Amino acid sequence: MLEYIDAHPGESGDVEFLSELASISPFHFHRVMSSYLGESVSSYVRRRALERAGLRMLLDGASVTTASALAGYSSSSAFARAFRRQFGSSPRQLAQGLHARRVMCAPCLPHGLEFRNVAAQEVLALRRYGAQHTAAPAAWAALKNCFVTGTPAAPPCWIGIPCDSPELTPVARRRYDACVDVALPADTSLVRKNLAGGDYAVFQFRGSLHALEDAHAALRWHWYPQSGARMRDAPAFHRLNDAAGDGELVAEIFFPIERAVARPRASASAVRPARNDALL
């Protein structure tokens, strides 16, 4: 249900419509979802739509008119008022505040840029909330505890998804999904999640969890604006060699881009040929 809401940011978030999709009564839908989300369904839908529109304004320079339509607002003035209530500043003020962020995160850029076309992938996911450097270890520890005794037939593929932009989403609402190959036997408390297929810019990373969070920010705010690419409407994710979150990590970071635009310009990092990659 949350994937549906995130995929339709301009919809009203009408509880009756969403409860019909979930095949339960509006009363129970609102009660269950509000308990899970920590906020009302309408508040969640409104916040996610504004965050999504805000990200397009900050990253792609989308106009207020375009962003208001993306967020489902009938007028630019209504969108601007809602934006200020949500973020405490206007889009222009927020963009100006991010200039220092771009400069600070530049040294954290990962290396080894290449382009891959990745097949869509279904995984099992476990979610935790908070800053990535605290939510990620908690999510990975809980995920490992879910697995039944036994040796998997093949080495697992561990994938981490920081779902939100720290510059726009409050710390308590930031989502981190620890994911693993669906072919592995797992406890039923895990949920199925779909990773979007398509073109990705892929970077190599080695370092700490703190540095991994900084690397994501560097791609978003420093590499992407200069790349000549356009970000697809899908989250970036990282594929880890270590699901425990302890010590130094070796990972690949996948940044979603559109095929319809020119390939991003190479930086100082070496660019390797594109290839197909099915994640596993």
Predicted region positions:
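Conserved hydrophobic/aromatic pocket- or pore-lining residues that grip, position, or stack substrates
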Residues: I5, F29, L219
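Pre-recognition alpha-helix immediately N-terminal to the DNA-recognition helix
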Residues: M1-Y4, R48-L55
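A solvent-exposed interaction/effector surface
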Residues: F17, S35, E39, S43, ...
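Short helix-capping/hinge SLiMs at alpha-helix to coil transitions
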Residues: A7-E11
